[in-house]
UniProtKB/Swiss-Prot annotation:
Residues annotated to bind Mg(2+) 1: 23
Cellular component GO terms held in the UniProt record: cytosol
Positions with a binding annotation for Mg(2+) 2: 23, 25, 181, 186
Protein name: Ribonuclease T
Subunit structure: Homodimer.
Enzyme class: hydrolase
Organism per entry: Shigella boydii serotype 4 (strain Sb227)
Length: 215
């Protein structure tokens, strides 16, 4: 059996990157000025046969940082009331500190080197997480500073769809539009979608890579 056929560990699959699925809900589009209101994260794992699956889930409602913009259109879109005491919101520091702690443990346990964000239209989520981490003065950010796995692009390639709901449905997954734009629900769906795309590529024979033929 070739060495490539043995590549069933998470650290082998993504060049040492530890994929973590993230979704955020915000009060606008500007990561520097608009509030981060909700964040969810799901770590991933591989079984002994190399199939990817969701692992640990974390979810936080987040207090707007001091001076944050709250765009009415964004709040109407996601249905979040930042002043609702029942949200149980925590500071950006508390939410990201806990996520980063769990992610660092996962990196170590899996033998990976660094985390990489998986998200749908990932630049948006990545920019808000990075901005919040900077505001919170969190120096040990385990995520790559710019590289991401964008499921909008991956789903466009694998499924011919770039909208999360349509990509999930095309992949044979349930998608409840009434729960959409909840960071927790969108993260769960994105995690399952990413695993399906990665596992589908494996089922089609794309991974492990075939060994180079000896001359």
């Amino acid at each position: 059996m070739s060495d490539n056929a043995q590549l069933t560990g998470l650290c082998d699959r993504f060049r040492g990157f530890y994929p973590v699925v993230i979704d955020v809900e915000t009060a606008g589009f500007n990561a520097k000025t608009d509030a981060l209101l909700e964040i969810a994260a799901i770590t991933l794992k591989m079984d002994e046969q190399g199939w990817l699956m969701p692992d640990t889930t974390l979810h936080f409602h987040v207090e707007p940082f001091v001076g944050a913009n709250l765009q009415p259109e964004a709040l109407a879109f996601n249905g979040i009331d930042p002043n609702d005491p029942d949200r149980g919101a925590v500071s950006e520091y508390e939410a990201l500190h806990e996520i980063f702690k769990v992610v660092r443990k996962g990196i170590k346990a899996s033998g990976c080197n660094r985390a990489i964000m998986v998200a749908h239209n990932a630049n948006f989520d990545h920019s808000f997480m990075i901005a919040a981490a900077e505001r919170a003065s969190l120096k040990r950010n385990p995520f790559h500073p710019f590289a991401t796995f964008d499921t909008a692009a991956l789903a466009g390639l694998a499924l011919g769809q770039t909208v999360l709901s349509k990509a999930c449905q095309t992949a044979g997954m349930d998608f409840d539009s009434t729960q959409a734009h909840s960071a927790l629900y969108d993260t769960e769906r994105t995690a399952v979608l990413f695993c399906e795309i990665v596992n589908r590529w494996k089922r089609l024979g794309g991974w492990p890579l075939p060994a180079a033929e000896e001359v």
